[in-house]
Amino acid sequence: MENIIMRNNLRQEIVTFGCRLNIYESEIIRKNLELSGLDNVAIFNTCAVTKSAEKQARQAIRKAKKNNPDLKIIVTGCSAQANPKMYGNMSEVDKVIGNEEKLLSHYYQITDQKISVNDIMSVKETACHLVSSFDGKSRAFIQVQNGCDHNCTFCIIPYVRGKSRSIPIGTIVAQVKHLVLKGFKEVVITGVDVTAYGSDLPGSPTFAQMIKRVLKLVPELKRMRLSSIDIAEIDDELFELIAYSERIMPHFHISVQSGDDMILKRMKRRHNRASVIEFCQKLRAIRPEVSFGADIIAGFPTETNEMFENTRKLILEAELQYLHVFPYSEREGTPAARMPQVPQNIRKERAKILRQDGFNQLNEFFKRHIGQKVELLIENNNIAHTENFIPVKLDKYLAIGQIFKAELVGIEEGYMKCVLV
């Protein structure tokens, strides 16, 4: 899992691991950190999805302290929320704060109280923070929701993010308007379980209703991108919206996890393999250019070779291109951790095979797009992305954050090449 590092002139550094919501929250941390005036400090915004993510964070902390012995280190994020004592016991760490505390700057001060992590399950509302810029990024992130009310057997996210809490539509609209005025052409709608949006708000507005309001009230917004969506929560209204709204980008990341129905049942997922295939095929029939990403767990407890092959078949049948594959990682206290485990070496081997399957699917997707006319959103390092999230390598500098028309002409090392038109 790649970490993102942000620095400024005050010798303040933020190292972000994990999801898009963490990226969004790191921008809030950056703003608060600048206001705090703290010098020679690093905040590690951690992830708790896998043991590997936690190991990466600990290694990065030790390396940072070794390189700068006077550096003050604050650890926060989902891993800190789940295991505050683990970080509190590290000699390199000066302060540990929870997921709610990290958004409040007074918790950044180094005091005798090394750990400040409160009960996230008691939080009833998600505070709204206006983020005006995203360091070095061409697209902006909008948080519409936090927390999760589901109980997948492998997941600890509900325990580190709390119950599902939604941000009112009016507040979201105001934020999007603000970001458009700042020059952003694309916003990414993000949260922990975005398609669960609204059930806790007065009148229970749906995710689709919220998206419609944003698109209607901010006509200047050119591109909207949705983060991970849950197949089980896609109703007819939402499907119609993403199928026919050209301003919603034709790239959707699905929380699939497995292509075997028995494994999905043991995970306590609310969809089956047929519903994934049906959704992808139905949407592709309307928007042929659409691409799909998916989270896949390799080697979930009790997964047999036949069950694993069902997942491989699903990738082909649903035509999933952008795969996030993780070897199953036991999370203490979860029901899945008590199930019969698949050996580690088999998990890793299956993950390797799935990643290759994903690479093959993506390469075929690239080939089908040679000669296609697209619009590119320009990013850092001469990289851009198409509407359906194909990464494109540019041969010259173009203004970051702007949109250019181009023709895709070839493939080169995981990217497509283009000529401007």
From Swiss-Prot:
Top EC class, one word: transferase
Residues in Radical SAM core domain copies: 134-364
Record carries keyword Iron: yes
Enzyme Commission designation: 2.8.4.5
Keyword terms: 4Fe-4S, Cytoplasm, Iron, Iron-sulfur, Metal-binding, S-adenosyl-L-methionine, Transferase, tRNA processing
Principal localisation: cytoplasm
Assigned GO CC terms: cytoplasm
Sites where the protein binds [4Fe-4S] cluster 1: 19, 47, 78
Protein origin, superkingdom: Bacteria
Cofactor remark: Binds 2 [4Fe-4S] clusters. One cluster is coordinated with 3 cysteines and an exchangeable S-adenosyl-L-methionine.
Compartments, record wording: Cytoplasm
Gene3D superfamilies the UniProt entry points to: Methylthiotransferase, N-terminal domain, tm_1862 like domain
Binding site for [4Fe-4S] cluster 2: 148, 152, 155
Essential cofactor(s): [4Fe-4S] cluster
GO MF, any single term: tRNA (N(6)-L-threonylcarbamoyladenosine(37)-C(2))-methylthiotransferase
Disulfide-bonded cysteines: none
Location of the MTTase N-terminal domain: 10-112
Catalytic activity: N(6)-L-threonylcarbamoyladenosine(37) in tRNA + (sulfur carrier)-SH + AH2 + 2 S-adenosyl-L-methionine = 2-methylsulfanyl-N(6)-L-threonylcarbamoyladenosine(37) in tRNA + (sulfur carrier)-H + 5'-deoxyadenosine + L-methionine + A + S-adenosyl-L-homocysteine + 2 H(+)
PANTHER family per record: RADICAL SAM PROTEINS, THREONYLCARBAMOYLADENOSINE TRNA METHYLTHIOTRANSFERASE
Family (UniProt): Belongs to the methylthiotransferase family. MtaB subfamily.
Biological role: Catalyzes the methylthiolation of N6-threonylcarbamoyladenosine (t(6)A), leading to the formation of 2-methylthio-N6-threonylcarbamoyladenosine (ms(2)t(6)A) at position 37 in tRNAs that read codons beginning with adenine.
NCBIfam families: MiaB-like-C (TIGR01579), MiaB/RimO family radical SAM methylthiotransferase (TIGR00089)
Protein name: Threonylcarbamoyladenosine tRNA methylthiotransferase MtaB
